[in-house]
Swiss-Prot record:
Its EC number is 3.4.22.52. Ca(2+) 3 binds at D619, D621, S623, T625, E630. This is Calpain-1 catalytic subunit. Residues 48-347 form the Calpain catalytic domain. Heterodimer of large (catalytic) and a small (regulatory) subunit. Its cofactor is Ca(2+). SUPFAM superfamilies: Calpain large subunit, middle domain (domain III), Cysteine proteinases, EF-hand. Ubiquitously expressed. Belongs to the peptidase C2 family.
Length: 705
């Protein structure tokens, strides 16, 4: 069962986020560590910082390849930079790509992303804050800001680094006195649990965590027809673009093609222009090789004859803006020579130039929980509908003069959270994806609805992720006519648990919201009956059990209910517990005696009989238990509409290990819900949706509930 403390922490986090905590200028203090306060403590006490949250030792290194008994970690010593060199520096002469040399860890994907970051000083210093030094106010403590699943976090580290034979074990700088890159790698390892968790990944993962952007990947051999349009729009938005040529064998790595392009090498795309060439429009693309001096020698390369056949003013403009390592080529040659294109679209807060057009961005958090919201993909029609649902209202079509299609562009990015951290306990990436459906007419304009199984059985998706894949993120750019749509994110298989964020980027303003039920209860007025309305047989049974005082205690109620339920052989039940019976007495007891009289017991019994009818209706396979996936519909039949978060709590509390719900747990859930709703309504007499209570009232409610 989810601990109450976990729920309370989630509520607190939601409130802080609503107040702007997690934005780049107000980053979350990771593990509640305050860099400035910790640094000041160390300065005042004259000590160097040692991080208690990420101690320098075997667990920080890893669990398998870098585990405590691995040959790779034998002889490792943790040392501060001042123990390695005489004059350690944080950054020497500005951050450059030569500051990042790989060590004994397979995290080249991360280092390539850090290297690309050095090309954009403004973005770099969002991640690597100014004012850090091994000289002025040095206290052995540093900090970095990294984007993690929808929010920026400020990560504190000490400067104890793993070494072997007096040299850094992992990333290091070619400038041996410089340590910013090694400390950034340590901060990233801390976020993910240990260094080993960083092994293996995609450069786009690092791009996103250092910018807060969203990545798209294109196979240029199967590119969409409007690939040039996509590149042009991405550059207009200030996106980071990278391209590469696939390697087909180990011998291809860094191999140079006939026209001087390097295989397996990361290039940047920096411009896209149209020129008039011999009376026809020619599309040109500018490429940058950030690591070396090898440049393209084909058409439109430096000094090629094509430049003689365009307007001199165009030639001067295009060639004046060139930097070292940059070259132009035709878009046709680009598509033929290169294999892959990666686009990292920056969110508005990362763009500072006013002339850049911007995505409109919405971020949602969600969870897949076994038994309540982990329905799997469309191949699982019985459970697909229980996945979280998010609505997008596309209001305006794109502004594309050359495009006659009335359509809206938007990008959907689904990212699973914290899976690297799970590697230590055998977890890894789930296979994830999403589908997009048009909202039915009857549900348009409403957020307080969760589309049910029948809708998905009758309707096909309008779009979906290109594939379900076991990467941290899957994203696709989609074009659809203006209208209302829902996005259903899911794992490929049902019952897989994970947290996720869903990001929706639209070119024009749009309305996006989670599609979920409005919490409500259809509570009928209390049943009005008198002793004269009760059958004689029921009275006699009650009198035999209640005795002379004509009231039954919690203990007697347990005996009665379990005796009656035992007669229903079609029900699987462990019987009602004492706590369950206490909750029932709490619901029905009007005089505060903690006992039930004849009329109170009759009303309770009538409720249980009506709930039994509902339970049998949703025990679809007549097994005597109800699937927790049907719990949502059963609760609605009983008058209760709950949102996804509440359903997850209900299933965690009342379902068994196989996600089944037996009759006694079903009744206990309904008793609890009715008690809580009735109490809330009694405290919210004006119907404002808010109840105010003092500490004593709060404790009475929670202790009795």
């Amino acid at each position: 069962m989810m601990p109450f403390g976990g729920i309370a922490a989630r509520l607190q986090r939601d409130r802080l986020r609503a107040e702007g905590v997690g934005e780049h200028n107000n980053a979350v203090k990771y593990l509640n560590q305050d860099y400035e306060a910790l640094k000041q403590e160390c300065i005042e006490s004259g000590t160097l910082f040692r991080d208690p949250q990420f101690p320098a030792g075997p667990t920080a290194l890893g669990f398998k390849e870098l585990g405590p008994y691995s040959s790779k970690t034998r002889g490792v010593e943790w040392k501060r930079p001042s123990e390695l060199v005489d004059d350690p520096q944080f950054i020497v002469g500005g951050a450059t790509r030569t500051d990042i040399c790989q060590g004994a860890l397979g995290d080249c994907w991360l280092l390539a992303a850090i290297g690309s970051l050095t090309l954009n000083e403004e973005l770099l210093h969002r991640v690597v804050p100014h004012g850090q030094s091994f000289q002025e106010d040095y206290a052995g403590i540093f900090h970095f800001q990294i984007w993690q699943f929808g929010e920026w976090v400020d990560v504190v580290v000490d400067d104890l680094l793993p070494t072997k034979d007096g040299e850094l074990l992992f990333v290091h700088s070619a400038e041996c006195t410089e340590f910013w890159s090694a400390l950034l790698e340590k901060a990233y390892a801390k976020l993910n649990g240990c260094y080993e968790s960083l092994s293996g990944g995609s450069t786009t993962e690092g791009f996103e965590d250092f910018t807060g952007g969203v990545a798209e990947m294109y196979d240029l051999k199967r590119a969409p027809r409007n690939m040039g349009h996509i590149i042009r729009k991405a550059l207009e938005r200030g996106s980071l673009l990278g391209c590469s040529i696939d390697i087909t064998s180990a011998f291809d790595m860094e191999a140079v093609t006939f026209k001087k392009l390097v295989k397996g090498h990361a290039y940047s795309v920096t411009a896209f222009k149209d020129v008039n060439y011999r009376g026809q429009q020619e599309q040109l693309i500018r490429i940058r090789n950030p690591w070396g001096q090898v440049e393209w020698t084909g058409a439109w390369s430096d000094g090629s004859s094509e430049w003689d056949n365009i307007d001199p003013s165009d030639r001067e403009e295009l060639q004046l803006k060139m930097e070292d390592g940059e070259f132009w080529m035709s878009f046709r040659d680009f598509m033929r020579e290169f294999s892959r294109l990666e686009i990292c679209n920056l969110t508005p807060d990362a763009l500072t130039k006013d002339e850049l057009s911007r995505w409109h961005t919405q971020v949602f958090e969600g969870t897949w929980r076994r038994g309540s919201t982990a329905g799997g993909c469309r191949n699982n029609p019985a459970t697909f509908w229980i996945n979280p649902q998010f609505k997008i209202k596309l209001l305006e079509e794109d502004d594309d003069p050359g495009d006659d299609e009335v359509a809206c562009s938007f990008l959907v990015a689904l990212m699973q959270k914290h899976r690297r951290r799970e590697r230590r306990v055998g977890g890894d990436m789930h296979t994830i994806g999403f589908a997009v459906y048009e909202v039915p007419e009857e549900a348009q304009g409403s957020q307080n609805v969760h589309l049910k199984k029948d809708f998905f059985l009758r309707n096909q998706s309008r779009a979906r992720s290109e594939t379900f894949i076991n990467l941290r993120e899957v994203s696709n750019q989609i074009r659809l006519p203006p209208g209302e749509y829902i996005v259903v994110p899911s794992t490929f298989e049902p019952h897989k648990e994970a947290d996720f964020i869903l990001r929706v980027f639209t070119e024009k303003q749009s309305d996006t919201a989670e599609l979920d039920e409005e919490i409500s209860a259809d509570l009928a007025d209390e049943e009005e009956i008198t002793e004269d309305d009760i059958e004689d047989g029921f009275k006699n049974m009650f009198q035999q059990l209640a005795g002379e005082d004509m009231e039954i205690s919690v203990f007697e109620l347990k005996t009665i209910l379990n005796r009656v339920i035992a007669r229903h052989k079609d029900l699987k039940t462990d019987g009602f517990s004492l706590d369950s019976c206490r909750n029932m007495v709490n619901l029905m007891d009007k005089d505060g005696s903690a006992r039930l009289g004849l009329v109170e017991f009759q009303i309770l019994w009538n409720k249980i009989r009506s709930w039994l009818t509902i339970f049998r209706q949703y025990d679809l396979d007549k097994s005597g238990t109800m699937s927790s996936y049907e719990m949502r519909m059963a609760l609605e039949s009983a008058g209760f509409k709950l949102n996804n978060k509440l359903h997850q709590v209900v299933v965690a509390r009342y379902a068994d290990a196989e996600t089944g719900v037996d009759f006694d747990n079903f009744v206990c859930c309904l008793v609890k819900l009715e008690t809580m709703f009735r109490f809330f309504h009694s405290m919210d007499r004006d119907g404002t949706g808010t109840a105010v209570m003092n500490l004593a009232e709060w404790l009475l409610l929670t202790m009795c509930g």
